[in-house]
Amino acid sequence: MGKIIGIDLGTTNSCVAIMDGTIPRVLENAEGDRTTPSIIAYTQDGETLVGQPAKRQAVTNPQNTLFAIKRLIGRRFQDEEVQRDVSIMPFKIIAADNGDAWVEVKGQKMAPPQISAEVLKKMKKTAEDYLGEPVTEAVITVPAYFNDAQRQATKDAGRIAGLEVKRIINEPTAAALAYGLDKGTGNRTIAVYDLGGGTFDISIIEIDEVDGEKTFEVLATNGDTHLGGEDFDSRLINYLVEEFKKDQGIDLRNDPLAMQRLKEAAEKAKIELSSAQQTDVNLPYITADATGPKHMNIKVTRAKLESLVEDLVNRSIEPLKVALQDAGLSVSDIDDVILVGGQTRMPMVQKKVAEFFGKEPRKDVNPDEAVAIGAAVQGGVLTGDVKDVLLLDVTPLSLGIETMGGVMTTLIAKNTTIPTKHSQVFSTAEDNQSAVTIHVLQGERKRAADNKSLGQFNLDGINPAPRGMPQIEVTFDIDADGILHVSAKDKNSGKEQKITIKASSGLNEDEIQKMVRDAEANAEADRKFEELVQTRNQGDHLLHSTRKQVEEAGDKLPADDKTAIESALTALETALKGEDKAAIEAKMQELAQVSQKLMEIAQQQHAQQQTAGADASANNAKDDDVVDAEFEEVKDKK
């Protein structure tokens, strides 16, 4: 078996590593660097440049130089975050025919996986140059909070690059593998804080060692997949643009060339301010007007940068609290804090994380390389080169289906270890229903409409039967890559239907954040809605059973009683369409009061049936002259 390489496909930079025996090794690219900018350029003469060569020519070719494509992968054009990027990116972001976010370069429409594949090809070539043999398999990392669509799109990018993606692995988990592999014996609980170029993740991971085998178990994960170094850069760029506008009266946003130079300068200044207290952004001939050329020379202090991005850093703290809560731990239970991603080099980020956990983060993990190393380790586990390592990851959000009353019924709860499979039996809501629609949802709210729809499909050919009788088995299966497969089967007819969640119906990052926040903020509203649905279902059942009893009673039910019951049934039916739980309960009570005569008739009929049954049994026993008899009680199926 050939080598399975480990690739960290980052928003800003990418990195590739392999297992050299039992030691992971980060590989240098053709330019001699251990990381490669995730930048792709299409030149005027038809050449495709990747990495540092693409970055070097960006200033002269801004519209055809693509960066931060990971922010678009597996996303819809109408997503709020994509729309924000549309206004600030120098290249053209467009809507594909299926509604996905694509880019247009020199009149050609391109999907994000196509573009990311160019970076993966360079990673593949770097590994092949080092190994001297073809490479066809890889483990690729994604943010822990990436959804089905984004994971699927990342696998597609690998396939386009000529790689069979053996496993998609979460970035914080990969970093934990890199950290934990060479550490001594003993059990540890670590927090991996991963703030990269475009995404943020926090994972709480337990490393256990039993008889020489290390188990890496993710207890909980949280994050924000639209928060990263690119956002920090944008804040500084906006500040510099406004300062220049105040000074010169010229808005640089209308000049793509100037904005590209400014982007490079802002990124450089941000990095310098991690070690220096102040820096100069000096850009001669940044633009010109009728009076001549204009130069930018603005002093930026570390304090100024921190004031510009403080709210971004604070945004990363809330997911830390949720992850700890989900893991059932407090900050004192965390033994080590690992920082991953280039943006964690910022002193303010390190300070905030240290304040939250009450301990200094470890400095012996390379934030740019740890994720690729972990991916290579996972590759080694899959080939058998790395033994005695078990990785247990989780799904970041709850998954379920819409059931009667517009409720989401959860089949797999968030932070469930994957791969996992869960089945549950549901039934029909109407008599003689021949088809059911399986509506797949992702999120934490009780009301189906408040969660993200991942897709839906129909199961047809159900045999006619009273409501509640057919048995529809719904199965959710999440594979090791975190990708969801759903099937529904009619246990009576054997008919089955399956769906794999496709890239066109994934969640976007902010929606995930919003779902969890909404679930916490709206816990009381959710509880009330759940109670309303329960009451509605009770009312619906009462409606159904009362109508059946009226039918069975026939002429035995006096006309006055029948009229009163019909009136109460209509009133209850109207109340069930509303949102008032108390009104439904009141109408149920009224129906019960006017149905007393009906209940008496029903009880009499039931007693007569039992008496008739007992008499028949006695006569049969006498006729057959049977001395010993065995009786088996047959209970009605509910």
Swiss-Prot record:
Q: Which PROSITE patterns match?
A: HSP70_1, HSP70_2, HSP70_3
Recite the UniProt keywords alphabetically: Acetylation, ATP-binding, Chaperone, Nucleotide-binding, Phosphoprotein, Stress response
Q: Could you tell me which InterPro entries the record lists for this protein?
A: ATPase_NBD, Chaperone_DnaK, Heat_shock_70_CS, HSP70_C_sf, HSP70_peptide-bd_sf, Hsp_70_fam
Q: Which residues carry this modification: Phosphothreonine?
A: 199
Q: What switches on its expression?
A: By stress conditions e.g. heat shock.
Q: Which Pfam families match?
A: HSP70
Query: What are this entry's molecular-function GO terms?
Result: ATP binding; ATP-dependent protein folding chaperone; unfolded protein binding
Q: Residue ranges under compositional bias (Low complexity)?
A: 602-620
Any idea which residues bear N6-acetyllysine here? Answer: 109, 245, 304, 421, 556
PANTHER family associated with the record: HEAT SHOCK PROTEIN 70KDA (PTHR19375)
| HAMAP family per UniProt | DnaK
Name assigned to this protein:
Chaperone protein DnaK
Could you tell me which species this protein originates from?
Answer: Shigella flexneri
